[in-house]
């Protein structure tokens, strides 16, 4: 440091200072504007990139919100379809049960009617056979008892007596 102070030359200092000032003026005149434009352009590029990133982020959030909304709607629609399918299944089961009960009841009523009809027919047939059999027995008994003249006259007199009483 002492050597620099001892070897100091004012002329050299002047020329170096003058060259530095001229260099600075030339830089300001010719290079400062392009450097500043480059820095400004770089700042604008960074600012635009940040804005684009922010816009992309917002758009991504909107897309995610839309995706979530669409997913929720799809789930709600699926749940509604499942609920409707369950209701249809339950309705079909209930309808089938009702139809089966009605068919069973109808068959029971038809069977009862058929049984009643068969019973009435059997009773009529039985009555017919009993009356035929009774007539046959009565005819045989009457033939047996009325085989002689005396019993025939007694019967006729008795019947005439009954008719007078009535």
Curated annotation (Swiss-Prot):
HAMAP family: ATP_synth_b_bprime. F-type ATPases have 2 components, F(1) - the catalytic core - and F(0) - the membrane proton channel. F(1) has five subunits: alpha(3), beta(3), gamma(1), delta(1), epsilon(1). F(0) has three main subunits: a(1), b(2) and c(10-14). The alpha and beta chains form an alternating ring which encloses part of the gamma chain. F(1) is attached to F(0) by a central stalk formed by the gamma and epsilon chains, while a peripheral stalk is formed by the delta and b chains. It comes from the Bacteria. F(1)F(0) ATP synthase produces ATP from ADP in the presence of a proton or sodium gradient. F-type ATPases consist of two structural domains, F(1) containing the extramembraneous catalytic core and F(0) containing the membrane proton channel, linked together by a central stalk and a peripheral stalk. During catalysis, ATP synthesis in the catalytic domain of F(1) is coupled via a rotary mechanism of the central stalk subunits to proton translocation. Belongs to the ATPase B chain family. It is a single-pass membrane protein. The chain crosses the membrane at residues 8-28. NCBIfam families: ATP_synt_b, PRK14471.1. One of its GO terms (molecular function) is proton-transporting ATP synthase activity, rotational mechanism. Gene3D superfamilies: F1F0 ATP synthase subunit B, membrane domain. Keywords: ATP synthesis, Cell inner membrane, Cell membrane, CF(0), Hydrogen ion transport, Ion transport, Membrane, Transmembrane, Transmembrane helix, Transport. It is found in: Cell inner membrane. It comes from Flavobacterium johnsoniae (strain ATCC 17061 / DSM 2064 / JCM 8514 / BCRC 14874 / CCUG 350202 / NBRC 14942 / NCIMB 11054 / UW101). This is ATP synthase subunit b. The lineage of its organism: Bacteria, Pseudomonadati, Bacteroidota, Flavobacteriia, Flavobacteriales. GO terms for cellular component: plasma membrane; proton-transporting ATP synthase complex. The keyword Protein biosynthesis does not apply.
């Amino acid at each position: 440091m002492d050597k620099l102070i001892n070897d100091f030359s004012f002329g050299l200092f002047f020329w170096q200072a003058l060259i530095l000032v001229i260099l600075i003026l030339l830089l300001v005149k010719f290079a400062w504007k392009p450097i500043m434009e480059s820095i400004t352009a770089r700042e604008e590029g960074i600012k635009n990139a940040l804005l684009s990133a922010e816009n992309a982020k917002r758009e991504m959030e909107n897309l995610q919100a839309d995706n979530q909304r669409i997913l929720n709607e799809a789930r709600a629609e699926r749940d509604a379809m499942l609920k409707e399918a369950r209701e249809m299944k339950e309705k079909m089961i209930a309808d089938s049960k009702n139809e089966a009960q009605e068919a069973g009841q109808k068959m029971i009523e038809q069977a009862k009617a058929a049984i009643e009809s068969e019973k009435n027919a059997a009773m009529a047939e039985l009555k017919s056979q009993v009356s035929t059999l009774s007539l046959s027995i009565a005819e045989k008994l009457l033939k047996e008892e009325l085989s002689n003249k005396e019993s025939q006259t007694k019967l006729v007199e008795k019947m005439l007596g009954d008719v007078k009483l009535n």
